[in-house]
């Protein structure tokens, strides 16, 4: 049957103190909304996102999924009802856009519990280490009779550890009806999604509870909670990498993106940061204090320490990128080496080429970027400036200190620096002259 997820993403997130919509704040290199969309993709046939007025950025981030606008912010139930035309004929699951850590398997469990047939409504619950002001789920094991807000709870109810964190599944027809029956007789005059339980129970419906780990159910309403969610996501990503055969000598200092792809037998030293779009092949070593984003690293390469790989970098098998070396939109061929203090931008470096310390590809003329091509087995001496567009042929040698502006043929030696001049005795004369003053 066609099942649909509805992500409620219309909130302003005022406690974030940001001009950016809350669901577009990043965790592990991608917006919170993107994490939810990825989880929903594994559990539902369709996903729709509810946004608010003037939230075009959220609609663009949700594409190609459809969006609907909650014209007035009158509460979470009102937001869900705005998407009623998208519920379809199967089951529908409502999730909050600021719960980015929930996983696809947990969402699948909600649907499976609904499919068991002994409950018409299923909600997601968790047991936080500090339940605090969360609403408590009251009922026999596995079921809910009501949700009691903390302010209204008795001491006995406050002692209950099972808390409501959002996430509701029901048949589409039931969900439409129950949402329409929720009232706004409360201090704020809003329509609250948590009242679904009371409305369903008033019809005699049974309400089941699916429990999920706390680290999947963290809400993000402030910068502090965003940092806590980031820490939880990083722990999850590190654990998955370690289980897949990656070595991290100090895992707590390594920061991964949600899409970081690490092969088995990769070794990562402390204080390495992965931005989005990094793929690392087997037997690669990434040394300490390196920063990588938007790059591909082939088997057996060695990166760092203190290396920076920027978007478009492609490191060949067995290549070396050493300390204080930066690459951007550059391919380093198999076995090539750039071991010290080098910038290679918009460049193609052939296999086994050796790039000396202090080499710079001068790729920007103030108006446009230009490419540098260095052939296989070429040797670039230290402190060389390659003024693009320029090419260096296979097996060519560039003398240290050269400024290369013209093509260098294969097997050629190129020197482009002033000739050294020596004046015997002149140093002694200068000392005498300076000393008399």
Curated annotation (Swiss-Prot):
GO cellular component, one term: cytoplasm
Binding site for acetyl-CoA: 357, 363-364, 382, 400, 417
Positions annotated as active site in the UniProt record: 340
Pfam families: Hexapep, NTP_transf_3
Purpose of the protein: Catalyzes the last two sequential reactions in the de novo biosynthetic pathway for UDP-N-acetylglucosamine (UDP-GlcNAc). The C-terminal domain catalyzes the transfer of acetyl group from acetyl coenzyme A to glucosamine-1-phosphate (GlcN-1-P) to produce N-acetylglucosamine-1-phosphate (GlcNAc-1-P), which is converted into UDP-GlcNAc by the transfer of uridine 5-monophosphate (from uridine 5-triphosphate), a reaction catalyzed by the N-terminal domain.
Family assignment from sequence similarity: In the N-terminal section; belongs to the N-acetylglucosamine-1-phosphate uridyltransferase family.
Domain of life: Bacteria
Protein name in the entry: Bifunctional protein GlmU
Keyword Methyltransferase belongs to the record: no
Catalysed transformations (reactions): alpha-D-glucosamine 1-phosphate + acetyl-CoA = N-acetyl-alpha-D-glucosamine 1-phosphate + CoA + H(+); N-acetyl-alpha-D-glucosamine 1-phosphate + UTP + H(+) = UDP-N-acetyl-alpha-D-glucosamine + diphosphate
Enzyme category, top tier: transferase
Gene name of the record: glmU
